[in-house]
Amino acid sequence: MIHDAVLDYYGRRLATCSSDRTIKIFEVEGETHRLTETLKGHEGAVWCVAWAHPKYGNILASSGYDGKVFIWREQGGAWQKIFDFALHKASVNIVSWSPHESGCLLACASSDGHVSVLEFKDNSFDHQTFLAHGQGVNSVSWAPSTAPGSIISTNATPAAQRRFVTGGSDNTLKIWSWDAASAQYRCEEGGVLSGHTDWVLDVDWSPTVLQKSYIASASQDRTVRIWTSDSSNPGVWQSRVLKEFDTTVWRVSWSLSGNVLAVSSGDNKVTLWKENLKGEWACVNSLED
């Protein structure tokens, strides 16, 4: 079974991972594709693959049931595993690279309840690991590097923020940000978001940098929630239920512009949602397998 499939920044390479413990790299040209590499090393199913921004080179991260995170790099047409992390005691469910403006940072979410953040610089990695959700972490998503509202602010350009959201088996979302004074990631004040009645399976922070921040969450309680926070009142989050679906909702994903949300549910359907001028969310398309 293939668990993840991700195109690189330019859409020319596709990485997939599966239950057979392998990662496959395909070259994509038009409507054709060609297998160019099979990467091995994980000792269990591989759940997730993620491409780093190309400014850092051809770098791919992978995570799996074996609790390991691998960093792979292509040089001279050959792929090599350059880092092998065993920071977790249970399955690492997802890995996510930060916006490149924030640095070369990789957040890893594990069933052991911890999140690790790896920072790559000068050909070495530093890491921080902290308890996020005691019953397990299922998902993680970075905020845009630019704070909401800042692009229309008259103030000087702020430093890129390091901020992300996690979703856990304790039915909550949590907002984390880098605290320079303590050199640690801390849960923000007002950053524990409650509303779901079952596991939060996926979260996605919208890339929009307008007046509001948007986070979408998918849950085993069969709902998708949209969480919003206005730049004029940071730290205060409000949520509304997008819809109660007939089955578990597995994944949510924003478009690059941040105005369309794709929802994948257990009935083999993908629905696309958009907010109208009244602030109401409506389904604009439905795709069925």
Curated annotation (Swiss-Prot):
Q: Which SMART domains match?
A: WD40 (SM00320)
- UniProt GO cellular component terms: COPII vesicle coat; endoplasmic reticulum membrane; GATOR2 complex; nuclear pore outer ring
Against PROSITE patterns, the record matches this protein to: WD_REPEATS_2, WD_REPEATS_REGION
Q: Which domain of life is it from?
A: Eukaryota
Q: Which InterPro entries match?
A: G-protein_beta_WD-40_rep, Sec13/Seh1_fam, WD40/YVTN_repeat-like_dom_sf, WD40_repeat_dom_sf, WD40_rpt
* Record's subcellular location: Cytoplasmic vesicle, COPII-coated vesicle membrane; Endoplasmic reticulum membrane; Nucleus, Nuclear pore complex
Biological processes annotated in GO: COPII-coated vesicle budding; ERAD pathway; mRNA transport; nuclear pore localization; positive regulation of DNA-templated transcription; positive regulation of ER to Golgi vesicle-mediated transport; positive regulation of protein exit from endoplasmic reticulum; positive regulation of TORC1 signaling
Its predominant location is: membrane
- How is this protein named in the record? Protein transport protein SEC13
Species annotation = Pyricularia oryzae (strain 70-15 / ATCC MYA-4617 / FGSC 8958) (Rice blast fungus)
